[in-house]
From Swiss-Prot:
The gene is cyoE. The chain crosses the membrane at residues 32-52, 54-74, 104-124, 126-146, 154-174, 180-200, 226-246, 247-267, 284-304. Carbon 2 of the heme B porphyrin ring is defined according to the Fischer nomenclature. It catalyses: heme b + (2E,6E)-farnesyl diphosphate + H2O = Fe(II)-heme o + diphosphate. One of its GO terms (biological process) is heme O biosynthetic process. GO terms for cellular component: plasma membrane. One of its GO terms (molecular function) is protoheme IX farnesyltransferase activity. This is Protoheme IX farnesyltransferase. Keywords: Cell inner membrane, Cell membrane, Heme biosynthesis, Membrane, Transferase, Transmembrane, Transmembrane helix.
Length: 304
């Protein structure tokens, strides 16, 4: 019997080629970037009383999104060894060998460079440099140093992740404004309880790879207390836009309800021993931030 030759079909080759981009897309953390871009968009909209000019809106979103994706890719590169040891991240492209280190590095640098050039040439220099500073803050200061150096890593490093509303604001106006900084303060206060809830759930994994997250170094109960205190601090921060006349009653009602919900979930985490509460707090925090900025947007166009 003659041997049968296995010849790859054009269809299978095309399918394989079409899937080649997926690991690179995954390295940009698209869900995280999408939430971040929502806060950028709100920053843009709140910067002007009417409609946002088209060029800074479109190019700004693309450029900031590209540099945020690049920062995420650098995070994948720097954390590739510990990612391979953690259940949450072991299936990422680099630990699994779906992308080589040189290709991942080339991708991250190219994405960052293109995003920077777009912002610098078609938006404004201030936004380009602020976005670059955010990339350095997240990829190098937080991921490469703070994450491994101190249990306060996410508190200090959270500033880089809190910058997007300011980036959106400067994309449109080309200058700093106190109102934009209030939005930064909100995300800065939101970040620790968001990440600490996840860290409680993944405490054993962080301990395994010697990452000094707060639950690992100070214990779960102490971390739960900190989460509760930070949700109260966040609730106060969320009132600041109302106190300075930046927002109206729609935002006041919406933000108050969201703050009460977050405090309740944190209280439940602290004083209830039901399993799975940490991940409930983590998931609620994502919806909290998303809905809070949507309420900001609605209030702006109803109250302006």
């Amino acid at each position: 019997m003659a041997k049968q030759l296995s010849i790859p079909s054009a269809t299978s080759g095309s399918k394989s080629h079409s899937l080649a981009w997926r690991p690179y897309y995954e390295m940009t953390k698209p869900k995280v970037v999408a939430l971040m871009l929502l806060t950028v968009l709100v920053g843009m909209c709140l910067a002007v009383p009417g409609s946002v000019p088209l060029q800074p809106l479109v190019i700004g979103m693309i450029g900031i999104g590209m540099m945020a994706g690049a920062a995420a890719a650098f995070n994948h590169l720097i954390d590739r060894k510990i990612d391979g040891l953690m259940a949450r991240t072991y299936n990422r492209p680099l630990p699994k060998g779906r992308v080589s280190i040189p290709k991942a590095l080339t991708f991250a640098i190219s994405l960052a460079a293109l995003g920077f050039v777009l912002l610098y040439t078609l938006v404004n220099e201030l936004t380009a440099w602020l976005t670059f500073a955010s990339l350095i803050g997240y990829a190098l200061v937080y991921t490469a140093y703070l994450k491994r150096a101190t249990p306060q890593n996410i508190v200090v490093g959270g500033l880089a992740g809190a910058m997007p509303p300011l980036l959106g604001w400067t994309s449109v106006t080309g200058e700093f404004h106190g109102h934009a900084l209030l939005l930064v303060i909100i995300i800065f206060a939101w970040t620790p309880p968001h990440f600490w809830a996840l860290a409680i759930h993944r405490k054993a994994e962080y301990a395994k790879v010697d990452i000094p997250m707060l639950p690992v170094t100070h214990g779960t109960e102490f971390t739960k207390t900190c989460i509760l205190l930070y949700t109260v601090l966040l609730a106060i921060a969320c009132l600041l836009p109302v106190l300075v006349g930046m927002c109206g009653p729609v935002y006041l009602v919406g933000s108050t309800l969201l703050s009460c919900g977050f405090i309740y979930k944190a209280w439940e985490l602290k004083f209830d021993d039901k399993p799975g509460l940490a991940m409930q707090v983590f998931r609620f925090s994502i919806y909290h931030l998303m809905l809070l900025f949507l309420v900001l947007l609605v209030d702006h166009y109803l109250w302006v």
